[in-house]
Design a protein with these regions (language model features):
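Conserved residues at the C-terminal ends of beta-strands
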Residues: 51, 106, 181
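Noncatalytic carbohydrate-binding groove/subsite architecture in carbohydrate-active enzymes
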Residues: 56-93, 122-296, 300
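Ligand-binding grooves and catalytic loops that recognize ribose/phosphate and carbohydrate rings
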Residues: 2-12, 16-18, 72-128
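Short acidic, S/G/P-rich loop/turn micro-motifs used as interaction or catalytic elements
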Residues: 22-26, 110-112, 184-187
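Boundary/entry segment of secreted carbohydrate-active catalytic domains
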Residues: 1-54
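Short, structured coil segments at secondary-structure junctions
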Residues: 43-44, 66-67, 98-99, 142
Length: 301
């Protein structure tokens, strides 16, 4: 299926939000219609990911009527190893009748929390791919557009490659897309190509002090002095590094696209179903923890 054949909202901005994981019906369709829909439109949002909880069909119909594209996750706690049950299929059918096309299911199969028993087994990727193929076929047969499940941020799991290796490259002739969770961590948006990672460029005193003075209840530098930060940046720089070396960042979609093209000979659509900056995140010590001001600036960027 060619890219232009995938349905998109009118005047698509590419901007989306992940709705609360709770029940849409908790606050009521009236408040969503009167308050939240105008807020979404004011921000330029065109895509809204929701869960298939009670009220999801009404919510999806409202989004479609307002020119927004719903992406529905079929929620199943600790779903692996298993495929959709009858209840899931009935709900998928109802959502498709309501106009929903994009479906997501069972993300991050590389994480313990997604497996019954709470642990990823040794042959997890093989078991997961078996279930994923079954679910993809189920949604495709009903006229839906399923996602290859997202793996966790920075994971090297190659689900597309495994599906192709099982002789099911034909699945990608249909309207399949790829979900990703390209969380930025506390790294800049152009990581790994930023000057800090490539050359170990030093922070200025002005930048350091601006973040140090921000009042938010935590220390952006985690007690490290400027000279300590700059020493760390120089020692841990990675000249020539590309996204293929480290994809735990915003640009993870470039990594996924390169692998997909290698396996399929072409790109397939990639939609980020979880991403962004998290206040307080500090996984890479070469960069400041994400403060509220940094969160705002980098999100707007």
């Amino acid at each position: 299926m060619d890219l232009h054949e995938y349905p998109r909202p009118a005047n698509d901005t590419g901007i989306g939000v992940h709705w609360t994981v709770g029940f849409a019906s908790t606050i009521g369709m009236g408040k969503i219609r009167d308050f939240w829909i105008p807020e979404l439109k004011a921000m330029g949002v065109k895509w809204v990911k929701i869960f298939n909880h009670d009220g999801a069909i009404d919510f999806a119909e409202l989004l479609l009527a307002e020119g927004l594209m719903p992406v529905v996750r079929i929620y199943r706690p600790s779903p692996y190893p298993s495929a959709f049950d009858l209840r899931d299929v009935v709900h998928i059918d109802a959502l498709i009748r309501a106009g929903v096309r994009y479906f997501e299911f069972n993300p991050e199969p590389d994480q313990d929390t997604e497996w019954k028993g709470g642990r990823v087994p040794a042959n997890a990727i093989e078991l997961a791919v078996e279930n994923i193929i079954t679910n993809l076929d189920t949604i495709l047969e009903r006229g839906g557009m399923p996602a290859i499940p997202a793996v966790s941020n920075g994971s090297r799991w190659d689900l597309v490659g495994k599906i192709v290796a099982r002789g099911r490259k034909d699945i990608f002739n249909g309207p399949v897309w790829h979900a990703i969770h390209n969380y930025s961590r506390n790294r800049p948006l152009d990581y790994p190509y930023d000057i800090g990672n490539q050359e170990g460029a030093s922070y200025t005193l002005r930048f350091y002090q601006t973040l140090a003075d921000e009042t938010w209840g935590e220390d952006a530098w985690r007690g490290r002095a400027l000279h300590e930060i700059n020493k760390l940046r120089l020692e841990r720089c990675n000249p020539g590094a590309t996204i293929m070396d480290d994809n735990a960042c915003w640009l993870a979609y470039e990594f996924m696209d390169a692998r997909n093209r290698r396996h399929l000979g072409r790109s397939i659509p990639i939609l980020s179903t979880e991403c962004g900056y998290l206040v307080g995140e500090d996984g890479d010590a070469r960069y400041p923890a994400t403060t509220p001001d940094l969160h705002m600036a980098q999100t707007l960027e």
